[in-house]
Amino acid sequence: MYNYIRIAFCCFSGIFLIACQTSRPVRWTGKKAVWQSLPSLPRTNSSDSISLGVSGHFSGITNGCILVAGGCNFLDKPASDGGVKRYYDSIWKLDTAGMMTGQWEKVGTLPHPVAYGASVSVSEGLVCIGGNNDKQSFSSAYLLSWNAVASQVDIIKLPELPFRMDNLAATSSANYIYVAGGNKNGMPANSFLRLNLNQLTKGWEILPDFPGCARLQPVLVSQHYDEGTQIYLSGGFQPEVYNSKPFIPTDLLSFSSMNNEWKLESAVPVMKGGELRTFTGGCAVSKGDSLIYFTGGVNYDRFLSAISMNRNLKLAEKNGKTSLFSRLTREKDSYLKHPVAWYKFNKEIFIYNTFTRKWAFLDDNEFTARAGASLLLLNKYFIIIGG
């Protein structure tokens, strides 16, 4: 079972890179159709292909600079041609002052090459949590902080997670870091934990699991009110586990720190044609005291077909449906070879108002039609990196 899950997810992450692999971050002012490109990540040598763009990276803003660390891509050839995924440990910095004309600078390395972890910016720096590479999954957590005096990135070790986690999501509120979803010791889980940055000796606190299916590659955001913190979880997917059908949620859950409970917050808006929508592999960021911006992610129908492929092949073979088995085999073999537009990555931007509990469409643009990217908030700007 473990091997099947890993194979299914490799297909998932590979699509991200084929469809929208880019090293040029994009700055969006929050107004319709106002987009600007930031400098591209450079190639440092012939063996470092980060200039091709990365997916599943850590990113955040600290001490007047943008940090991008880790991530993965395909060095020699794309996944559709049998390419091998490469994982990185580089840490890159771009000063926010003059970022439109500035240059990225390599300022350090992570403890290990890693992608598909979770990261979140706090006042002290960028917190990086979990992740995996081609050899293992990680329980590590550490803080990256730009030291302007020493012109270096300081890496401060934080308490390790109680188990190995990857393909999870993270957010912060007040002095807490929250993480949810992903794989737990290699298996999809409903895990939900938090770390008090003011009481590190207590380590990670295990909170109530979120309800429903497990969620790999979800999005997680928070809003802090006088009464406490509200956490919002959407997207993600559950592959075939214990003979259950793969499942992609199309809802938004919320967790209240006041009563320590999860609830169904809202359904996600459907597509223009009435098809289901998911923010799986997408991005979300909160702004102000009531707004959450959602961008990107996979197409529900396309991705459900992909993660159901192995199960459907087994059933067709078991039931002697040779023509169906042949057709599904052809579809599986060609899945990574379609033109970019075929994958239908979400290009719409939606806003959810946590006070009114209503959704509003804001804009659509090909810049947001990506998955495995990161979305940062800098004053009045949104910055989309990688994917």
Located regions from the model:
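Kelch-like beta-propeller repeat domains
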Residues: 24-387
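C-terminal motif of bacterial Sec signal peptides marking the signal peptidase cleavage site
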Residues: 18-19
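Bacterial N-terminal signal peptides that target proteins for export
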Residues: 1-8
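Alpha-helical hydrophobic membrane-insertion segments
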Residues: 8-14
